[in-house]
Amino acid sequence: MASRDFLGRFGGEKGAASDKAGGGAGEADEVAELSLGLSLGGCFGANSGRDAKKPRLVRSSSLAAMCSLPGTSDDLAAATPPPAPLMRTSSLPTETEEERWRRREMQSLKRLQAKRKRLERRTSMNSGKSGGSSSRDDAQEPLYPSAFQLRRSVVDQGNPSSSMPEQGSGDGAEVKSTSSMEISSDNNNNASNQNKSLPPPAPSPAAGKLPNGIVKEQPPLRTLRSLTMRTTSTGDLRKSMMEDMPMVSSKVDGPNGKKIDGFLYKYRKGEEVRIVCVCHGNFLTPAEFVKHAGGGDVTNPLRHIVVNPSPSVFL
């Protein structure tokens, strides 16, 4: 009895232990694996055993294709939501075509306004300059008559019959006089317009004054008397030069002899006589001058040199 109880108790404990072990294994199977280790496919608790139909935890992933769970496609579609669309970021805000065109139109309008202001400023400056010059011309017009007006007045004074009609000529003379008067008035108008357009003439040289009020002396005019005096002075100078440095020429006989002109250079007492050759401009002694003319070595070279009292062409 005791042995039975012992065996039964012992066997019961064994059965109870086996029951407890079975219950613990079931509970261990029911507990999900929540370890921090990496798993293939990004899924936790994926057992291919008898508990494959139990709900499992799904790890989030950036790509939906990475998660592969055993089961039907409907369960996967219900378990994994569709990924949100990715938005591309940019540093500058995107602008539409209308804003771009509006900005370009504003820039073109600003450029046109600036250009218009520059043109208005330039025209105002030009008008001010033209107004000042016209007033200056009007002020100087009665002081300086034009050359055309002077010529017209001289012609009218020389031909009085052209401006006055002949007496007793009848209607033809009157028509001629009226037409001549109209032509003269038109010419006067044209002359006044030309006078306005021409710059004012320069003041006369005799009345030249400096800014300090000092009258500047002008050079004398070249008159006929001054020219004659100048010619006489040059003639006197040439005459004095001929007296100081007379013209000479060589007189050499022989086949190699030739005539060479020169002039006796001015010298003082005690200095050597020197002759300037006209053909080369060299300063030569009398012996060298005769040798230059082809005379060779002579004992008295001054006998072969002739003094010309008349002026030479070279002076």
Curated annotation (Swiss-Prot):
Keywords (A to Z) from UniProt: Nucleus
Signal peptide location: none
Basic and acidic residues compositional bias, start-end: 99-108
Subcellular location field: Nucleus
Chain intervals with Low complexity compositional bias: 184-197, 221-234
Region (Disordered): 1-28, 68-142, 156-237
Naturally occurring in which organism (per UniProt): Triticum aestivum (Wheat)
Protein's name according to its UniProt entry: Ninja-family protein 1
GO cellular component: a single term: nucleus
Residue ranges with Polar residues bias: 156-166
Keyword Chloroplast recorded: no
Pfam families, per the entry: EAR (PF07897), NLS_NINJA_AFP (PF16136), TDBD (PF16135)
Family assignment from sequence similarity: Belongs to the Ninja family.
Family matches, as InterPro entries: Ninja_fam, Ninja_motif, NLS_NINJA_AFP-like, TDBD
Gene Ontology biological process terms from the UniProt entry: negative regulation of DNA-templated transcription; signal transduction
